[in-house]
Every structure is written in C-alpha cells, then in structure tokens.
Amino acid sequence: MGEENEQRIGERVYEFLRREGKDEQKMRVTIPEVLNCQYGMYVWPCAVVLAQYLWYHRKNLADKRVLEVGAGVSLPGILAAKCGAKVILSDSAEMPQCLENCRRSCKMNNIVGVPVIGLTWGEVSPDLLDLPPIDIILGSDVFYEPKDFEDILLTVRFLMERMPQAEFWTTYQVRSADWSVEALLCKWNLKCTNVPLKTFDADNECLAGSELPGRHTVQMMIITLDRKGAGHTG
C-alpha cells in the first residue's frame, strides 16, 4: 500500500472505435501508469499503434495464443485478451515492478487467467521452455536499445522453431537512421514485412482517444521465419 502511494499510480483510458456501415464497435482499456523514471511503467507511442493494429484485426484474434514480450503496462496484450485471444504477458525477469504492473493492468480490466511471466531476452529460461506453442508474439518498442536487438530476435527465433507459422507483430519508433535489424534478420533466418499505418487507420497523431503517438515516427512490421533464407522483404 505504502509502496503504491510512493509510486504515484495513475490511470489512463484508451477507447478504440470502429465504424462499419451503421454499426459502431467500441472497446475501452484502462491502463495503470506508474509515474516514475522506469520506462516500462507507462504507455509509449508504439504501444498505441500496435494496439490499433490488434483492434483493426480483432476478428482474427479469437482463441489465438498470444505472447506479449517486454509488455510493460501491457496495452496491446490487454486489448488482445479482451478480443478473445489466449494471452500470456511477459517482461524481464529482472524487472519485477513491470511484472507487477502487468498484473495490475489485468486486474484493472477485470481480466482473469492471464499468466504473467519473467522472460529475459536472449536467455533460454525454464519459463521460456515451458511456454505453449504461440501463434502471435507482440512487442511494442522493444527495439529501443541496439544492444538488445539480437537478444530479442534470438528469443523470437526460439519460439518460432516450435511454431513455424508464428508471427512477430512489432512496432518501433524511429530514433536513428543508423539503427537497423536487417543484418540480424538475415543471421537468424527471419524476414520482415513493413505494414503502412494507413492500412489499419493508425496514420494520425491521436489514436484511441489519446494524444499518442503524437508526432513520433512509428513503424509497424511483421517478422516471420524466412524459409528461403532471403532475409528482409517489404
């Protein structure tokens, strides 16, 4: 109780809308944000864009086995769960505060039965080995520190070895023209397809009733196994 007060936990509501003819569909997600310096404790622009992609494709999520990596406050994972996916949330085993915030997000949205596990990128841990086959891996802004890029892709590749049809849906914020994962994709026999934001109604500065992503340059890509060893496409 005292710790939560010290952390100054706030709430932010995201409301996703979709009009199809005269029919309007709506979904609300409430996210707890801990107002401190740890960047995994509040919503970043990439998370809203990835959540918008999930919302746009919500009809394809029912009963899909979904793992969110580097979940932080879990906006995409929570939305996927509310759309009927079988979700597992994960963040670094070395960041228990983020894991607790994943649980807090579930509780705040009345979601039960969603496992929250510690996964450290690049490590083949017991929790990683115990995961069931995964259909979709989610990751928003996980390509944040270049030193982590290969560990992220190593973890993704390990999961895809067990489920070759799996896809890694990820958004990232363009911070430097010098940063690229292309060589690493080739190394780990992966390929990616860029998804234009306009194709899922994410090409504006304000999504889900928020002020995000703002003017940040966010890109969306889908990473899969490259069976031909061709590397990067799209």
Swiss-Prot record:
Its EC number is 2.1.1.319. It is an enzyme of class 2 (transferase). Its main location: nucleus. The keyword Cytoplasm applies. GO terms for molecular function: histone H3R17 methyltransferase activity; protein-arginine omega-N asymmetric methyltransferase activity. One of its GO terms (biological process) is methylation. InterPro entries: Methyltransf_16, SAM-dependent_MTases_sf. Keywords: Chromatin regulator, Cytoplasm, Methyltransferase, Nucleus, S-adenosyl-L-methionine, Transferase. GO terms for cellular component: cytoplasm; nucleus. Belongs to the methyltransferase superfamily. METTL23 family. This is Histone-arginine methyltransferase METTL23.
